[in-house]
Amino acid sequence: MLDKGEYSFSTCWNIKKHTIGRDMIEEIKELGFRQVELNYNVTEEMMKTIEPMIEKGEIGVSSVHNVFPFIDDKDYDTDSVMLGFDDEVKRKRSVELLIRSMEYANRYGAKAVVVHPGEVPFEYNIDLDLKKLYRDHGKDSPEYQKLWKDMSERRERLSPLYTKRIQDSLEEVSEHAAKQGWSVAIGIETRSRSYQMPTLMEAKTICENLKGGPVYLWYDIGHAMMMDRMGLYDNLKELQEVKRYIYGVHIHETLELSDHWCSYVHSKDLQYFDHFLEAIDFAKVKVYELKAVCQPDEIDESHKLITSKIAAMKG
């Protein structure tokens, strides 16, 4: 397999089929990757066989994904109010968990922690209903537009409150990291549900207000494509505004509203993803975040297309 150089690869691709950490990492190494992103499902048990690999230099860690290692608590899972909790005890716990993830990142020599910072809470997963209406009736249908209006009115009304609270939490974490002398970036990730935070402009606000600290945008390309399709923001236009805040990227493509596919290969569109090549090139950490059905030859082909196109773009 082609040596993937500076590009890293998320363990989300094969974590469900492994119980032994070393086996999971070896399979990723066989794809030609020298670095991995340890995602939030990696357990302490799995790390017992991965840590010796890190120590011996058999694998590098580009990034870890908060909450890391895995904790079995729905309040702090991947779809949570997290750093924006109204409940101060829960908010403090979220801060502590992010600090814990940063400790591990620092120990493993990782450059960044990827974090889902929060959301505007709803009583139920309204995004699930929106996606169903989008698929069944289309974005321009009255059914979709009505529910979208209901969602976005609440989201816009409460966004400043949750943006500020997330920002305050990130400031606490940043201050702790500075005292520890950690050189680890915190990447706030673009999300896959319309009520989740941040949008690109919310990320810009947070990054600007915490300028000089370790907080950056983690640009998840496939998620941003999906949010653009649903109508949350103008991805291509706003990307130009936020590009300078990007620290890392999650590389994958979204087909309709289905994410984590190999760029170019599964969409069979050899042009549209070109819009994101500058962001990939600019990012200090470049991570493929792919679903299990992506095959090694497809991953290879996608990587060749991305890297050759970037090389051509740079002349």
Enumerate the language-model features and the residues they cover:
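Histidine-acidic metal/acid-base catalytic patches
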Residues: 1-11, 19-27, 44, 55-57, ...
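N-terminal pre-domain/capping segments
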Residues: 1-101, 106, 137, 142, ...
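Short amphipathic alpha-helical segments, especially helix-boundary/capping motifs
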Residues: 1-2, 24-28, 75-79, 146-151, ...
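Short, charged helix-to-loop "capping" segments that act as catalytic/coupling loops
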Residues: 72-76, 179-182, 192-196, 228-232
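Conserved beta-strand edge residues that scaffold enzyme active sites
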Residues: 42-43, 68, 119-120, 193, ...
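Active-site acidic/histidine proton-transfer and metal-coordination neighborhood
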Residues: 83-216
